[in-house]
Regions:
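Alpha/beta-hydrolase fold catalytic core
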Residues: 1-51, 73-76, 113, 294-306
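Gly/Ala-rich beta-loop-alpha elbow adjacent to hydrolase catalytic centers
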Residues: 121, 125, 129
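Conserved alpha/beta-hydrolase catalytic His-Asp/Glu region
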Residues: 171-228
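Catalytic histidine-centered segment of alpha/beta-hydrolase-like enzymes
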Residues: 273-282, 286
Length: 306
């Protein structure tokens, strides 16, 4: 694992492309999945072929606000969910990759993404996308895994250290106080205006006394069931990977994922990007995703892939 850690660059006005993306029309919705209300946003024409975007640990649907409109501009229906325990979705007593994969498929249907959908996941979301491919493969058009760490055996000690970085449920006396404590895990330099946007959507009032807390369930790791086993046969959809040059997915990990999923899975590297590629090199990420989706839309799947 490697990460780029720098001081934040000086604040500057958000560029036109970013403000235009945030102003793009979006539908907000929710669907019940196994007793939990799962929220999502959607862009582009309902009923069109499209994509479900899956965030990483402690993140939420709004991490994609400046990415999704670019994909929708290509005529796609694009939905971004907040998985249970994240964003404005409900918390659960227990969490699992299997449950999150069910939420992804439920949102694809509720948001009217025409079947079969593409699934794109960042970090933890890439793990969810991979499991969804193993479980529902022939019902998917393909998955893109963005800078997801792929380990053999138990997670290494540095992953446990990262988990501790998500905190323990502390509250703060004001919105300003909690926003001042917003941190990325792992820390890295990102675009200040993107950071400010996602931070603003990461907090909420916690009680009538005026305390503020994070939207994600900070007991998430304690409530996680054992990880899903890897697939025992090749997945039945196409697979691509996007790696950040200074991110968490090494070339060795990319090879490990290819082996697990049983697909050739090209890997595109985003130069100069850290793990949080949505926040530091978003336009390069958009270009990579557009290229993959355009290629898949225009060509037939390989033999052995539905």
């Amino acid at each position: 694992m490697s990460a780029v850690i720098h001081e934040e660059p000086p604040a500057r006005p958000a560029p036109q492309w970013f403000t235009a993306a945030l102003a793009a029309p979006a539908d907000d919705g929710a669907v019940d999945v196994a007793g939990a209300r799962i929220t999502y946003r959607a862009w582009g024409p309902a009923g069109a072929p499209g994509v479900v975007l899956v965030h990483g640990t402690a993140a939420h649907a709004r991490w994609w606000d400046h990415i999704a409109p670019f994909l929708a501009a290509d005529g796609l229906r694009v939905a971004a969910l907040s998985m249970s325990g994240h964003g404005d979705s409900d918390w659960r007593d227990r969490y699992s990759i299997r449950q999150w994969s069910e939420e992804v498929m439920a949102v694809a249907s509720a948001a009217r993404v025409a079947a079969p959908p593409f699934i794109i996941g960042h970090s933890l979301g890439g793990g969810v996308a991979s499991y969804t491919a193993a479980r529902y493969g022939s019902a998917l058009a393909g998955i893109v895994v963005i800078d997801t760490a792929v380990h053999e055996g138990p997670p290494p000690p540095e992953m446990t250290t990262m988990e501790m970085g998500f905190g323990t449920g502390r509250t703060y006396p004001s919105r300003e106080a909690i926003l001042a404590r917003f941190r990325l895990v792992p820390e890295q330099q990102v675009l200040p205006y993107v950071r400010e946007h996602i931070a603003a959507w990461s907090v909420r009032p916690r009680d009538e006394a005026g305390q503020w807390g994070w939207k994600f369930d900070q007991s998430l790791f304690a409530k996680m069931d054992s990880q899903a086993p890897p697939p025992t046969e090749p997945v039945r959809c196409r697979v691509a990977m996007v790696r950040a040059q200074h991110g968490m997915m090494t070339a060795e990990m990319a090879g490990r994922l290819r082996s697990r999923l049983g697909q050739p899975a090209p890997a595109i590297e985003i130069p100069a990007a850290g793990h949080h590629v949505l926040l530091d090199e978003p336009l390069s990420l958009v270009t990579a995703l557009r290229a993959v989706l355009a290629n898949w839309t225009a060509t037939q799947p390989r033999d052995g892939v539905v």
